[in-house]
Amino acid sequence: MRLLKTHPILGLANSYLIDSPQPSNISYMWNFGSLLGVCLIIQILTGVFLAMHYTPSVDLAFISVEHIMRDVNYGWLIRYLHANTASFFFIFVYLHIGRGLYYGSYKSPRTLLWSIGVIILVLMMAIAFLGYVLPYGQMSLWGATVITNLLSAIPWIGQDFVEFVWGGFSVNNATLNRFFSLHYLLPFVLAALAAMHLLALHEHGSSNPLGVSGNTDRLPFHPYFTFKDLVTIFVFLLALSLFVFYMPNAMGHSDNYIPANPMQTPASIVPEWYLLPFYAILRSIPSKLIGVLAMFMSLLILLGMPILDTSRIRGSQFRPLMRFSFWTFVACFFILMFIGSQHVESPYVEIGAAATAYYFAWFLVVVPAIGIIENTLMDIALTEETSSFHRVV
């Protein structure tokens, strides 16, 4: 035990995973960190093994993926683990962010922790998009063409910048090579950001469902929370196994089993399900440039939450108005996800525009307004209480 505390590396592990004091009342909503860590480890390991057999070439990419599936020992398992864990990764990230928004985890003193988390989200989406292109099926090619073409909205240099990203005049061998290179590199950057996220968390410790700060009533991470985390990790592995072994393509797109053909456009070009809400925001605005800016701002606006939430109370658990508005925001997010998967036609265009307007209004109008209303009501109540106390005295 003494070595565990004094050794420079083991001591670090001890302070994070064994002796770290955690609030005794944190619920299962605080388990997503460990689940995301497991997802990241699975993704890096399976990704490295897939890269050993993958060929980043427009002629051989699709064939090399089929080779992995048919000829490599347990190649099908590695690929399906990689594809389905990516979906679970995003499910857990969205739940993690939702918990952060509900319980006010972005408020001081955890603003740095929140900011690093938002950067991780943006990087995850970039990595997911790069990976979606690599099998080089129909959705891969046309998804890459559509999304990279968004850069052409940049004034003056847009088209030149798109061709710079492509390495030619269309999606070609150079594009696939650089996408593969970046898709291999960026998860390690993501792992470094995850380490920074943990460092920032360790500075002030975890928040808790009550939203109060304090060093009393805490428990060591091990054994209490290691075993609590193991419960959700095993449930996740069971759910992942169900998808991998029984319905491995449920969260994918069947068009990606058709080899990429630049001469034939698919009936509908849609990204993976976890990018659909932001794709819906992009499509809801007629102006290309404003649509692209709105799509990026829909993610980056999360960075503003510590400023936009004007309430003196951390979290929504004791704030009925905020709690109601939070669930309307969740409903709006799911509506956007549905709209992103539909064709660009009435009434989906109108519903998407309304949902996009509410998405931004929630951050810029609803959250600040509710905070101001609550603060005002508290001030009035406090003033009345003080005046009645003075009358009694």
Swiss-Prot record:
The gene is COB. Coiled coil: none annotated. SUPFAM superfamilies: a domain/subunit of cytochrome bc1 complex (Ubiquinol-cytochrome c reductase), Transmembrane di-heme cytochromes. Heme b b566 binds at H96, H197. Fungal cytochrome b-c1 complex contains 10 subunits; 3 respiratory subunits, 2 core proteins and 5 low-molecular weight proteins. Cytochrome b-c1 complex is a homodimer. The chain crosses the membrane at residues 32-52, 76-98, 113-133, 179-199, 225-245, 289-309, 321-341, 348-368. This is Cytochrome b. Binds 2 heme b groups non-covalently.
